[in-house]
Design a protein with these regions (language model features):
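Residues that flank catalytic or metal-binding motifs in active/ligand-binding sites
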Residues: 43, 60, 94-96, 145
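Short, structured beta-strand-loop surface elements
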Residues: 78-132, 139-143, 151
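Short beta-strand segments
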Residues: 42-77
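Basic, alpha-helical terminal appendages of large translation-related enzymes
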Residues: 1-2, 147
Length: 152
């Protein structure tokens, strides 16, 4: 299913201040690269999107979960905050301008938002591989979007 903006929540975990996130992002990327693209026991990919409002390219490290068919699942969790992460809004605005870097290789990807049974299967995989994600629905009342990224 194409990407569509999911409703935001009315409650959630406290978000990181925007300025702190902007200042820390380049440092976090360097640290993650040195740790072989892993963080907290999870594999990462570097997601590049085009800003929904700014039009500027943005790259963020995101936990990735192999879909078993050569693609990856990513969860727009934002740690269980009431709002989706900025990268999700960027994808909604520009779904045809998304790329990833995995294991040093960059490629453009097609993005599908999962729903129904596909979403449930992916969510089960995510929680099995990264149990901390299972706590996020307790923090927020929004459904956490799960996106499948497939090499184009």
């Amino acid at each position: 299913m194409p990407v569509r903006k999911s409703p935001e929540g009315t409650r959630g975990a406290r978000p990181m201040p925007r300025l702190a996130g902007k200042l820390l992002q380049p440092l976090m990327i360097r640290i993650h690269r040195r740790s072989k693209d892993r963080f907290g026991g999870m594999n990462l990919l570097y997601l590049t999107t085009v800003g929904a409002r700014s039009g500027e390219r943005r790259t963020v490290p995101v936990a990735r979960f192999d879909d078993g068919a050569g693609g990856w699942y990513v969860v727009a969790s934002a740690g269980g905050t009431a709002r989706h992460p900025a990268w999700y809004y960027n994808i909604v605005a520009h779904p045809d301008q998304v790329s990833v870097e995995v294991a040093g290789t960059s490629r453009r990807v097609e993005v599908d938002q999962l729903e129904g049974e596909d979403r449930e299967r992916a969510w089960d995989l995510v929680v099995r591989e990264a149990p901390r994600f299972g706590t996020y629905p307790e923090k927020t009342d929004r459904e956490l979007p799960i996106l499948r990224l497939t090499p184009a």
